[in-house]
C-alpha cells in the first residue's frame, strides 16, 4: 500500500474570561484611564487619523520621563504548591537531570510536575484538560513557574517541545489581571515570530486556550492585504501575534500602538536574527515600557541572541533543555546517504516508495532554495506523486491552502524551504533533506 500504488494515493488516479487573578477589572480600567499619560508613545503608533500614505517614523520615547507617569501593573501570580515546597533539593536536581534541564540565574522557582501544581486558575486548567494532555513537558514544568513569577526569562528548547503553551497560558493569566482595554488601546500581550506560518500556529493556540476568558487576538503578518488585519486591530485585541516587518507598518500608520504591552514574547529569537529582523525587533521593543515582563525563546543560544537578551531583559532567569549546541533529536532515526546530484531524483523516488507503504504517512521534503523546491515538486507530480510546494514566493492564500491539503492528507507530500516549513506544527512521519543547507539550523 502506498501513495503511488494503492487506492487513496494511486498515481494513475491522482489528479494533477473569568476566574482567579482577575479582580475588579472594570474599576481598574477607570483608574488606568485616569492615570494614563495621554502623550506617551504619541510618535510610536498612536491612532490619530493618519493615512496609509503618511507613515511616521517610530521614535523611542524618553523612558526616564515617561515611566514615572505610567500606572503600575501586576505580573507576579505564582503561588508555590505545598507539594512543590516539600520536595528536597535532591529530588529537584534529579528531576532536572532526567529532563536534561540546565538553569541559570538566582531565586529560580522549583519545577512543577503536574498541571495542578502550576497554580493556574480553574478556567485555564479546564482548557488544558479538555485537550487531553496528561502531564506538562519538561520546558513547561520549569517554564510555567518562571513565567508566572513575573520575572524576565529565557527558554532554550527545540521546536516542538511545548514552548508555545509555556508562554501562552501565563500570558492569559497576565491579561486577566490587567485593566480592560479601552477604545484605541493596543494589546497587552505581544508575541513576535519570524514567519507567517509560526504566527498563525501561535494564534491557534491562543484562540484555543483564551476562549473561556473571551480574550481576543489578532495575527499580523505580511504577504496579504492589510485591510482585515487593520479591522481586527481597530476592534481591539488583548493578544497580538506578529512578524516584525508588518507590525512596524501598522505602528507607523497609526493602526495600533504598544502603550499597553506589559508582557512581551520573542519566539524563535535565533531564527528572527538569522532572517535579518534584528533592527526591526529593536525598533519595536524600544516602543514598549521597560518595566514589562519579557520572555525570550530560542532553539539555540548564539552570541547574537545573548546580546539581544543582554540589551532588553532585566536580570533574567534561564532554563535550557538539552545541549546549548544543536544536536539530533533522540526521537528521530536518521539515515545519511551521500549521492551525486544526478542520482538524487531516483534515490528520492525510491525512498518515497518505502515511506508511502503506510497510506497515512505525511512526508516533508526540504530543499535549500525556492527554485529547487519548485523543481522537485514538478518532477514528483510528473511522476504521479501528490506533492505540493511551499516557500516565501507563494502568496499567503496559496500557502494556507497547501498547508491545509498537507494537514488533511489530500496531498501527503510537501516540498518546502526550511524557513517556510518552520512552525508548521503538525505531525510528520518522514523528512527528506534533498539539499544540504549551509547553516547549522
Curated annotation (Swiss-Prot):
GO biological process, one term: termination of RNA polymerase II transcription
Basic and acidic residues composition-biased segments: 19-38
Helicase ATP-binding domain segment(s): 144-319
Keyword Cytoplasm carried by entry: yes
Stored Pfam families: DEAD (PF00270), Helicase_C (PF00271)
Keyword Hydrolase: yes
Reactions this protein catalyses: ATP + H2O = ADP + phosphate + H(+)
SMART domains reported in the protein's UniProt record: DEXDc, HELICc
Domain of life: Eukaryota
Cross-referenced CDD domains: DEADc_DDX5_DDX17 (cd17966), SF2_C_DEAD (cd18787)
Cited PANTHER family: ATP-DEPENDENT RNA HELICASE DBP3
Function summary: ATP-dependent RNA helicase involved nonsense-mediated mRNA decay and ribosome biogenesis through rRNA processing.
Protein name from the UniProt record: ATP-dependent RNA helicase DBP2
Amino acid at each position: 500500500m502506498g501513495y503511488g500504488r494503492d487506492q487513496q494515493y494511486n498515481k494513475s488516479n491522482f489528479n494533477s474570561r473569568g476566574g482567579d487573578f482577575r479582580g475588579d477589572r472594570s474599576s481598574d480600567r477607570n483608574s488606568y484611564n485616569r492615570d494614563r499619560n495621554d502623550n506617551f508613545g504619541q510618535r510610536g503608533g498612536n491612532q490619530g487619523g493618519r493615512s496609509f500614505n503618511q507613515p511616521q517614523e517610530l521614535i523611542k520615547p524618553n523612558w526616564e520621563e515617561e515611566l514615572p507617569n505610567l500606572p503600575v501593573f501586576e505580573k507576579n501570580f505564582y503561588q508555590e504548591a505545598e507539594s512543590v515546597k516539600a520536595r528536597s533539593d535532591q529530588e529537584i536536581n534529579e528531576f532536572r537531570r532526567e529532563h536534561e534541564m540546565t538553569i541559570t540565574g538566582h531565586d529560580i522557582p522549583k519545577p512543577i510536575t503536574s498541571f495542578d501544581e502550576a497554580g493556574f486558575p480553574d478556567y485555564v486548567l479546564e482548557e488544558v484538560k479538555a485537550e487531553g494532555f496528561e502531564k506538562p513537558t519538561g520546558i513547561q514544568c520549569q517554564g510555567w513557574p518562571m513565567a508566572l513569577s513575573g520575572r524576565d526569562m529565557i527558554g532554550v528548547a527545540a521546536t516542538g517541545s511545548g514552548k508555545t503553551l509555556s508562554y501562552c497560558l501565563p500570558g492569559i493569566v497576565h491579561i486577566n489581571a490587567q485593566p480592560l482595554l479601552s477604545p484605541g488601546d493596543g494589546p497587552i500581550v505581544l508575541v513576535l515570530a519570524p514567519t507567517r506560518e509560526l504566527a498563525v500556529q501561535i494564534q491557534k493556540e491562543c484562540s484555543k486556550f483564551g476562549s473561556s476568558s473571551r480574550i481576543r487576538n489578532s495575527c499580523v503578518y505580511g504577504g496579504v492585504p492589510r485591510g482585515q488585519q487593520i479591522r481586527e486591530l481597530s476592534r481591539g485585541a488583548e493578544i497580538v501575534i506578529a512578524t516584525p516587518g508588518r507590525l512596524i507598518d501598522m505602528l507607523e500608520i497609526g493602526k495600533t500602538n504598544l502603550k499597553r504591552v506589559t508582557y512581551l514574547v520573542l519566539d524563535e529569537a535565533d531564527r528572527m536574527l538569522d532572517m535579518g529582523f534584528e533592527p526591526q525587533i529593536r525598533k519595536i521593543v524600544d516602543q514598549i515600557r521597560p518595566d514589562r515582563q519579557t520572555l525570550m525563546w530560542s532553539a539555540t543560544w548564539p552570541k547574537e541572541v545573548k546580546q539581544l537578551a543582554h540589551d532588553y531583559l532585566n536580570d533574567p532567569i534561564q532554563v535550557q533543555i538539552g545541549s546549548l549546541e544543536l544536536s539530533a533529536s533522540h526521537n528521530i532515526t536518521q539515515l545519511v546517504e551521500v549521492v551525486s546530484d544526478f542520482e538524487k531524483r531516483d534515490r528520492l523516488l525510491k525512498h518515497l516508495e518505502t515511506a508511502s507503504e503506510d497510506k497515512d504517512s505525511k512526508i516533508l521534503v526540504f530543499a535549500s532554495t525556492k527554485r529547487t523546491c519548485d523543481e522537485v515538486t514538478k518532477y514528483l507530480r510528473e511522476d504521479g506523486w501528490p506533492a505540493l510546494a511551499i516557500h516565501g514566493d507563494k502568496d499567503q492564500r496559496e500557502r494556507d491552502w497547501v498547508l491545509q491539503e498537507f494537514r488533511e492528507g489530500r496531498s501527503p507530500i510537501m516540498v518546502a524551504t526550511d524557513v517556510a516549513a518552520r512552525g508548521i506544527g503538525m505531525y510528520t512521519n518522514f523528512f527528506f533533506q534533498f539539499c544540504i543547507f549551509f547553516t547549522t539550523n
